[in-house]
């Protein structure tokens, strides 16, 4: 589960894709 704004964070954006 990814929180909103995680996609903007390079440390978490990889989980957004």
Swiss-Prot record:
Domain of life per record: Eukaryota
Propeptide position ranges: 1-4
Keyword Secreted annotated: yes
Main subcellular location: secreted
Tissue note: Expressed by the venom duct.
Phenotypic consequence of residue 15 to E: No loss of activity
Keyword match Ligase: no
Compartment(s) where it occurs, according to its Swiss-Prot or TrEMBL record: Secreted
PTM notes: Not hydroxylated. Hydroxylation improves its folding but impairs its activity against target receptors.
Annotated site location: Important for binding to human alpha-7 nAChR: 9-11, 13-14
Domain text: The cysteine framework is I (CC-C-C). Alpha4/3 pattern.
UniProt name for this protein: Alpha-conotoxin ImI
């Amino acid at each position: 589960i990814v929180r909103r704004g995680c996609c903007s964070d390079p440390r978490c954006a990889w989980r957004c894709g």
